[in-house]
Swiss-Prot record:
The lineage of its organism: Bacteria, Pseudomonadati, Pseudomonadota, Alphaproteobacteria, Hyphomicrobiales. One of its GO terms (molecular function) is S-adenosylmethionine:tRNA ribosyltransferase-isomerase activity. This is S-adenosylmethionine:tRNA ribosyltransferase-isomerase. Keywords: Cytoplasm, Queuosine biosynthesis, S-adenosyl-L-methionine, Transferase. It comes from Beijerinckia indica subsp. indica (strain ATCC 9039 / DSM 1715 / NCIMB 8712). SUPFAM superfamilies: QueA-like (SSF111337).
Length: 367
């Protein structure tokens, strides 16, 4: 399909730079493609659209402070380096985007440290093991596993998306705001943002409806923010991300479907993982590994019935995903409504609850 079909104009003031407080005070647009219904609600009303026997699947990945500031030394000269980790390759290995990258050489060491008033914390070092295109390198750190994670927590910054970081610097509040209540397994460099709306109060209300909450893991990579540069979706190559669906969770989800319950994915990351794990017969299998699944209109969804998600960028793979799930025409209308009604967009913005389209809704007029 032509990528320009997924383009739309978004006023800059619709981009949320901070989340609402409390988290469940965000707005919720409910979209039912088959009936054409589109209604405005609040996030606290989410339980009203769920029923006993349903299951809500959340992503328990934890965002690491993946943006590091340091320097490389060459003789007596020093050059500042910024590195954004985006994919773990081993206990002490990470792929990263660095800048400036042009003069950085394989074999050089980058020293990362945070300067505190009157002191300098213990530094972290990484050797450049490989150098690729567009500023990508492989870094080998002098710490591994939990010790490396602890150093990143101390020295790193939250890797805010470019549409936020381009307008303000990350701060200590982002360390709280850009982490979900379900965060447990470290490895993501972007938050599964649909779950940022949950509070203990909202979780309790959902469980009181007889809805079970299940956890899966997908370590969200920086590729989630990469623009689609191709003119046709067939020419786009999707980034890979590591995920896991345990045998216990897979068996439970299949049991829910067999009993007539619905699977609600909290976020596109949960949906992408479940649709990577499902077989041709609609049974979800245990899964552990990388997925580069790419969904555009015409994709056949087998696992997920309802999707909770934020509002996404134009021409992005995530907007293509929601168009595949609920229909292109439906989502173009929904986004036009959201813009006109002053919904807040992107990671810190509002949410929409999408019921899966069961008929062909893949064509539509301009937004």
């Amino acid at each position: 399909m032509r990528v320009d079909l997924f383009d739309f104009d978004l006023p800059p003031e619709r981009i949320a730079l901070r989340p609402v407080e409390p988290r469940d005070a965000s707005r919720l647009l409910v979209v039912r493609p088959d009936s054409g219904d589109m209604t405005d609600h609040g996030m606290r009303e989410l339980p009203d659209f769920l029923r006993a026997g349903d299951v809500l699947v959340v992503n328990d990945t934890r965002v690491i402070p993946a943006r590091l500031h340091g320097f490389r030394s060459r003789g007596e000269s020093r050059a500042k380096i910024e590195a954004t980790l985006h994919k773990r390759e081993g206990e002490a290995l990470w792929r990263a985007f660095v800048k400036p990258a042009k003069k950085l050489r394989v074999g050089e060491t980058i020293c990362f440290a945070r300067q505190e008033p009157g002191t300098e914390v213990e530094s972290l070092e990484a050797e450049v093991l490989e150098k690729g295109a567009e500023g990508e390198v492989v870094l080998g750190f002098n710490r591994a596993g939990a010790a490396l994670d602890a150093a990143l927590d101390l020295l790193g910054e939250m890797p805010l998306p470019p549409y936020i970081a381009g307008k303000r610097a990350p701060d200590s509040q982002d360390s709280l705001d850009y982490q979900t209540l379900f965060a447990n397994r470290s490895g993501a460099v972007a938050a599964p943002t649909a779950s940022l709306h949950f509070t203990p109060r909202l979780i309790a209300a959902i469980e009181a409806r007889g809805v079970t909450i299940c956890k899966v893991t997908l370590h969200v990579g920086a590729g989630t923010f990469l623009p689609v540069k191709a003119e046709d979706t067939d020419a786009h190559r999707m980034h890979a991300e590591w995920g896991e669906v345990s045998a216990e969770v897979a068996a439970f989800l299949n049991k829910v479907h067999a009993a007539g319950g619905r699977i609600i994915a909290a976020g596109t990351t949960s949906l992408r993982l479940l649709e990577s794990a499902v077989d041709e017969d609609g049974l979800i299998q245990p899964f552990q590994g990388e997925t580069s699944i790419f969904m555009t209109p015409g994709f056949r969804f087998r696992a997920v019935d309802i999707l909770l998600t934020n509002f996404h960028l134009p021409r992005s793979t995530l907007f293509m995903l929601v168009c595949a799930f609920a229909g292109l025409e439906t989502m173009r209308r929904a986004y036009a409504h959201a813009i006109a009604a002053s919904y807040r967009f992107y990671s810190y913005g509002d949410a929409c609850l999408l019921f899966r389209a069961t008929r062909n809704t893949s064509t539509g007029a301009a937004l």
